[in-house]
Amino acid sequence: MRVAMVAYEVYPFAKVGGLADVVGSLPKVIEKQGVKVTVFMPFHKIVSKNCEKLGLEIKEVARAISLPNLQTKEKFDLYKSTVPATNVSVYFISNDYYFSADNVYEGPDLAEQSIFFSNAAIEAMKYLSETFDIVHAHDWQTGLVPVYLKTLYRTDPFFNRTATVFTIHNLGYQGVFNPGYMKFAGLPAYLFNIDGLEFYGQINFLKGGILFSDIVTTVSPTYAQEIQTEQFGEKLDGVLRLRAEDLYGILNGIDYSEYNPATDKRIYVNYDIDHIEKKKMNKSELQKELNLQVRDDVPLIGMINRLVDQKGLDLIEKIVDYMMMFDIQFVVLGTGDKKYEEFFKNIEKKYPQKISSNMKFDVDLAQKIYAASDMFLMPSRYEPCGLGQMYSLRYGTVPIVRYTGGLADSVKEYDPKTRDGNGFGFREYDTAHLLETVAKAVYFYKKEKDHWGKVVKNAMKTDVSWDRSAKQYLKIYQEALRKKQF
């Protein structure tokens, strides 16, 4: 089986969020199942820098390939590299006008960029003369890939046997634009209707991916159910219910070779489940680095997030002073809404030896926080999958979560009677339940040392690898091919 993955960001070439981790890791494990995977992504400005840093070669494949379907004279060049330690080829769609911004999701026109990339990825496949059984597109930026394949390329013999899979990583980001972009995209006018791309008078790229792909997946079983409800459906719940028979939730995993406390070079001291006492050394070193009091008797709570409403930061705003009464330390890493950045800067000033606010994106510091923290806080309003809780489990850092989406699928409440469970959580989205859950975790840390040791070991034993998920994706690909045949 041959699979083409199309995504806007892929680790280690360009990373902004969890999408890059997923599309960087999934091909590796699918490849081990005997599937040949090829990845297509834009040649963002950061790609060259990252390849140079990693010693990865970039080869020129072709220049000035035209896009006859689009209303543009812009052409694209094609370059190639390889995902490290694999045989997975990565092809870069290069165009100086669309992909020369410093940041991945910036540029002259996000709608045009996504249209250009989606069509260019398809034309790149044709140029390479590589036929694919599956084209697997990710998120709204590639939502038009299934649309193109089911319309303008429907009778193209090159894609005659190609089935499509579309993955929703976060329904909150849909790519909604002025309908005038239909003309630029070269798409037929009849697609602008309620059963097509039309969405409250606009066009919706994500809706296109949902309606025109053979199979739709999202990133956890619970989230797949949630998004079919009005509460979580972001006005697409009706469309998703229409595709319910073809909608699957597959929990993401993490790359165990990349995230391994026993070998991770970015943390202070390596450790494993048999030498878990060394985890404390990471804690004291991080406390020193961040100018916190060096104390093992107080729990260190870490939080690494985009600083946006989705992540439950409005709850933290209201209870942080009460949290400090528990005698804890709190480390925050992330960027986002200015109001939250200012909030975290201000509480650091208020509690200088207890709180460290780091308003930046720093991969190395993130790894240190995962390894050094006793607990990891994720009180999300909604969370399609979440990777932070998986990294924390891998490093023996006990997650405190709101049970929603992938958090509900990966974190199980610790039960002192059965000594089963790997974390602590709450369901109702309010300050009282969050504060109660933090208090519970702090109590176990300070007063129930035996139970705390058990929940830490349970966390480290939790399987959050890609292996199980990769097998599920193989079944999905086979199902997509079966549907394509009808």
Swiss-Prot record:
Pfam families (UniProt xref): Glyco_transf_5 (PF08323), Glycos_transf_1 (PF00534)
Reaction catalysed by this enzyme: [(1->4)-alpha-D-glucosyl](n) + ADP-alpha-D-glucose = [(1->4)-alpha-D-glucosyl](n+1) + ADP + H(+)
The keyword Transferase appears for this protein: yes
Keyword Cytoplasm tagged: no
Pathway: Glycan biosynthesis; glycogen biosynthesis
GO biological process, one term: glycogen biosynthetic process
SUPFAM superfamilies (alphabetical): UDP-Glycosyltransferase/glycogen phosphorylase (SSF53756)
Coiled-coil portions: none
Keywords, ordered alphabetically: Glycogen biosynthesis, Glycosyltransferase, Transferase
Binding site for ADP-alpha-D-glucose: 15
Highest taxon above the source species: Bacteria
Leading EC class: transferase
Signal peptide range in chain numbering: none
CDD domains: GT5_Glycogen_synthase_DULL1-like
A GO term, aspect molecular function: alpha-1,4-glucan glucosyltransferase (ADP-glucose donor) activity
Enzyme Commission no: 2.4.1.21
Family: Belongs to the glycosyltransferase 1 family. Bacterial/plant glycogen synthase subfamily.
Role this protein plays: Synthesizes alpha-1,4-glucan chains using ADP-glucose.
HAMAP family in UniProt: Glycogen_synth
Name by which UniProt lists this protein: Glycogen synthase
Species of the source: Pseudothermotoga lettingae (strain ATCC BAA-301 / DSM 14385 / NBRC 107922 / TMO)
